[in-house]
């Protein structure tokens, strides 16, 4: 089980990224706009760099819903590999069976 502070930090990153998403897109399009003068583009770039670091969605890390484990995450189920194995062995995931050949 991950520390609660780590899970809360990830939730905060998600909130901040959603809050600044529109602003980031707007500033990025202005930075790429060739019709603006270099000084204006530089000013826009400074505004973009003044945004919080956590507003970037790249900084987010996917975590297991039940344990908060950051590694071995399987997107389809939203669980880590360890937790998915436990849940699958109990038969809680419909259609998921252990492979045998």
UniProtKB/Swiss-Prot annotation:
Disulfide bonds: none annotated. Part of the 30S ribosomal subunit. Contacts proteins S3 and S10. PANTHER family: 30S RIBOSOMAL PROTEIN S14, SMALL RIBOSOMAL SUBUNIT PROTEIN US14M. InterPro entries: Ribosomal_uS14, Ribosomal_uS14_bac/plastid, Ribosomal_uS14_CS. Belongs to the universal ribosomal protein uS14 family. Transmembrane segments: none annotated. One of its GO terms (molecular function) is rRNA binding. Keywords: Ribonucleoprotein, Ribosomal protein, RNA-binding, rRNA-binding. Residues 59-72 have a biased composition (Basic residues). GO terms for biological process: translation. Residues 52-72 are annotated as: Disordered. One of its GO terms (cellular component) is small ribosomal subunit. It holds the Pfam family Ribosomal_S14. This is Small ribosomal subunit protein uS14. Binds 16S rRNA, required for the assembly of 30S particles and may also be responsible for determining the conformation of the 16S rRNA at the A site.
């Amino acid at each position: 089980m991950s520390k609660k502070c780590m899970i809360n930090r990830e939730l905060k990153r998600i909130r901040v990224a959603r809050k600044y998403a529109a602003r980031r897109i707007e500033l990025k399009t202005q930075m790429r706009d060739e019709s603006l003068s270099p000084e204006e583009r530089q000013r826009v770039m400074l505004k973009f760099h003044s945004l919080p670091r956590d507003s970037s969605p790249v900084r987010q890390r996917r975590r297991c819903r039940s344990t908060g484990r950051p590694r071995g995450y399987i997107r389809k189920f939203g669980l880590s590999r360890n937790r998915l194995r436990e849940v699958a062995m109990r038969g809680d995931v419909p259609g998921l069976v252990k492979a045998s050949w």
